[in-house]
Amino acid sequence: MEIIRAKHMGFCFGVLEAINVCNSLVEEKGRKYILGMLVHNKQVVEDMERKGFKLVTEDELLNDMDELKEDDIVVIRAHGTSKSVHEKLKERKVKVFDATCIFVNKIRQEIEIANENGYSILFMGDKNHPEVKGVISFADDIQIFESFEEAKKLKIDLDKTYLLSTQTTLNKKKFEEIKKYFKENYKNVVIFDKICGATAVRQKAVEDLAVKVEVMIIVGDTKSSNTKKLYEISKKLNDNSYLVENEEQLDLSIFRGKEVVGITAGASTPEETIMNIEKKVRGIYKMSNVNENQNEFSLMLEEFLPNQEKRVEGVIESMDQNFSYLDVPGERTAVRVRTDELKDYKVGDTVEVLITGLSEEDDDQEYITASRRKIEVEKNWEKIEDSFKNKTILDAKVTKKIKGGYLVEAFLYPGFLPNSLSEISDSEEKVNGKKIQVIVKDIKMDPKDKKNRKITYSVKDIRLAEQEKEFAGLAVGQIVDCVVTEVLDFGLAVDINTLKGFIHISEVSWKRLDKLSDNYKVGDKIKAVVVSLDEAKRNVKLSIKKLEEDPWATVANEFKVDDEIEGIVTKVLPYGAFVEIKPGVEGLVHISDFSWTKKKVNVADYVKEREKIKVRITDLHPEDRKLKLGIKQLVANPWETAEKDFAIDTVIKGKVVEVKPFGIFVEIADGIDAFVHSSDYNWVGEEIPKFEIGNEVELKITELDLNNKKIKGSLKALRKSPWEHAMEEYKVGTTVEKKIKTVADFGLFIELIKGIDGFIPTQFASKEFIKNIRDKFSEGDVVKAQVVEVNKETQKIKLSIKKIEIEEEKREEREQIEKYSTSSSEE
C-alpha cells in the first residue's frame, strides 16, 4: 500500500512555538498555568499536564487572580486571550509567557490600531472560537459575521471608514468571495487579509492530494477549527475522507481493497501521532517517544563535548589535508588531530590537545586520537558564562536549520536558537553559515555530567535591549528619522533604528491621500514627530503632517457660510465629491447638493478629479474639521417659483427626455420634468402618438405637487374630448339615424360619433310591447331615434325610437284630421 503525505501538514510554526515555550519552562519554579487549551490537540495538552502545567479557563483564571503570586507562570495559548485577561495579568505582575500565534497577534494589533483611529471593524469568523473571542475584545466598534449571506446584511454607513479582517483559520476561498463583494460595493472598506499562511498552504495541499488517492485520512483534534476545515475540503473532493484524532480511532476496514492512501494533519497535530497512524496502516504500529529535535541537539553535544580524558602538549611533525601528526613525549605512538582544528598552527609549533582515544580498527596504523577544538571549547566557556550573566554580545554562526529553530555555534559552543528568538525570516533560504550576533539566553547542565551543557541563544534579546535603551531616549514631540518598512492601505510601518513605529494615514498629510503607495515606498527615509509612546507595548505612534502647521487653524478667519469659492476636486465617489478649498482643507459636496431638480445624479457627470470648480459653503465647523459644500446653491431653486410658472391649466412646451411604457417625461424647464401618463396622450378614437427622446411637445399642466416636487401634464387636454363634441351635436330633441352597434337584453347601443355611444333602453325601442328585443332588432339595422336625455356627470346620452314612432303616429293623425276636415268643408 502506498501512503502519500500532503505537501504541507502537521505542526505550524505558531503551534510549535507554543509547545517550545512550555517545554522551556518545565524546570522553572512556581505554579505553572496554561490559559485554555494550549493548542487544539488532546495529546499535546495531556503531555503538558504530565509536565506539571495546569489548564485553566479564562473565567477560572479571573476568579483566582488574587491567589496568583509573582513567581507563578501563566502561558497564554496559541489562540490568544481577551484584553481584560491581559490587563489583569499585567496588574498581578505574574510571569506571563505569551504563546499567541504571530498571525493572531498581527490581526489583533491592526484591529486595535484601526479602532483607535476611528475605524469601525467588520470581522469574519466563528464568534464562539477562542481566537475570535480574544481578538474582538480589543475593539469597541465591531460587527461580526460568519457567512457571505450575513455579510450582505451588515449595516454599512457610507460616512464611516471600516477595516475588514478575518479569523486566521478561515477557509481562504470563502474570504476571497467576501473580499470581492466589499471591493465591488464599498469604497470605504479597507481590507486586512491575514489568513494564516500555514492554513492557506495546508488547505491547498489537501485539495491537491484528495483527488489523487483512494482514501484520505485527516489527523487532528475534532475541536480544532483548521482541522475541521481540512476535513470539509477533503470530503467535498473525496467521499472516502475520514477525520481521526489518533491511531485508536482508525478503522482498518476502510482500507480494504485500497492501494493509495493520503494523509494530512491539522496545525496542532504532533508528528508522533501522524507516524503512529502511518504505522498502523502498514500493520507495523508500535509506540515511539523520540523527540527529534532533542536527539539531534544531544548528539551534537556528544560530538563536541565528550568526557575529558587527558591533556598533553606535542610538536606538530607533519600536516596533510585531513590530519596532522604530533610527537607527544611519553606516548607510544603518534598523536593524530584533524587538520581543520589546527588552522592557526604550522609544522614545528607546539600545541596542547586532549587525548580522546584510539583510531578505528580498520585504519592501516594505530594512532592516538586527540582534539584541539575541545581544549579551545573549555577555554571559551568563560565568555559563554559572561554572556549569560551580563548579556554581553557574542559573534556566532548558524550551522543548521532544524525543526523549531536553528543550531548555532558561538566560540565553538553549539546551542539552540529557537525560531521565536532568531529574528531570521521564514522566507530566508540560505541560513547555514550565516554570521549573526547572539547572547546566551539560558544554560542547563546535567548534574551527573557537567560537560553536558545545553545552551539557548537569542538574537531577539539584543534587539529588545537596544530598543529599551532607544525607547527611553524618546519623548512626545521629538522629531526622529525613520525608514519605511511597509506601506499599508491605512498607514506606514517604519523603523526608528531598532524600534518599530506606525504612522496612520490620517497623520501622513493634511491633504487627502487615498493611496499611500503613490507617495511612499519601502526604504524611503522620512522625518516624523512622536505623538504617543506606549511603554508596555513599546509602541511608537508618529505624525508627518504635524511637522507643518494645521491648515484648519486659520479656516475660521478665511471662510464663512455662504461664501462662493473655487476649489479642486480631489475625490469623486458614488455619494458625492471632495473638494479642496485650500491645501489640506477639504469639504464634501453631497450627491443631494449637485442639482435642485435631478433626483438621480451621477456625480461623475458633474465633476472630474483635479478639476477646478466653483462651490458655496453651506456648513462650516472648523473645530470639528467639518466642511459642507454645495453646487446647486450657486443658483436659485426653480421650485420656489414653480407655483407661478407652472400653475394648473398652464400650456407649455418642452422636450421629451425619457420614454417609458407607461408614459413620457418632458423637460419643461432646466432640470424640471413633467410626467404625461400614456392615458393622457389622446382621446378614444384618436391615433396613439409615438415619441422619441428629443421630440418637442406641447402639454397642459394638470397637477402640481410642490411638497414632492412632482408635475403632471396632459396632451389630450389641449383638445376637446369626444364627449364635448357629442354634447354640442346631440342636444335633447335631436333626431338621428344610426346603425345599431350592439343588441343587449336591456336595450340597443348606437355609435353617435367615434368613441361615444348612445343608449336606447328596451322600453324606448318601440311603442309596442317587446317581449324579446333580439326578435325585433339586429346589429347593423338602421334606426331612427330622438335624444331624450344628456347626462353630463355620467357622460351618457339616452335616445328613444318609441318617441319618434309616437310623434309620427300623432303627425299622421293630424294629417288625417286635416285631410277629412278639408274634404268636409269642400262638400
UniProtKB/Swiss-Prot annotation:
Residues at which isopentenyl diphosphate binds: H40, H79, H129, S224, S225, N226, S268
Keyword presence, RNA-binding: no
GO MF annotations in UniProt: 4 iron, 4 sulfur cluster binding; 4-hydroxy-3-methylbut-2-enyl diphosphate reductase activity; metal ion binding; nucleic acid binding
Residues binding [4Fe-4S] cluster, per UniProt: C12, C101, C196
Reactions performed catalytically: isopentenyl diphosphate + 2 oxidized [2Fe-2S]-[ferredoxin] + H2O = (2E)-4-hydroxy-3-methylbut-2-enyl diphosphate + 2 reduced [2Fe-2S]-[ferredoxin] + 2 H(+); dimethylallyl diphosphate + 2 oxidized [2Fe-2S]-[ferredoxin] + H2O = (2E)-4-hydroxy-3-methylbut-2-enyl diphosphate + 2 reduced [2Fe-2S]-[ferredoxin] + 2 H(+)
Binding site for (2E)-4-hydroxy-3-methylbut-2-enyl diphosphate: H40, H79, H129, T168, S224, S225, N226, S268
Protein family per UniProt: In the N-terminal section; belongs to the IspH family.
Protein's recorded name: 4-hydroxy-3-methylbut-2-enyl diphosphate reductase
Provenance organism: Fusobacterium nucleatum subsp. nucleatum (strain ATCC 25586 / DSM 15643 / BCRC 10681 / CIP 101130 / JCM 8532 / KCTC 2640 / LMG 13131 / VPI 4355)
Gene: ispH
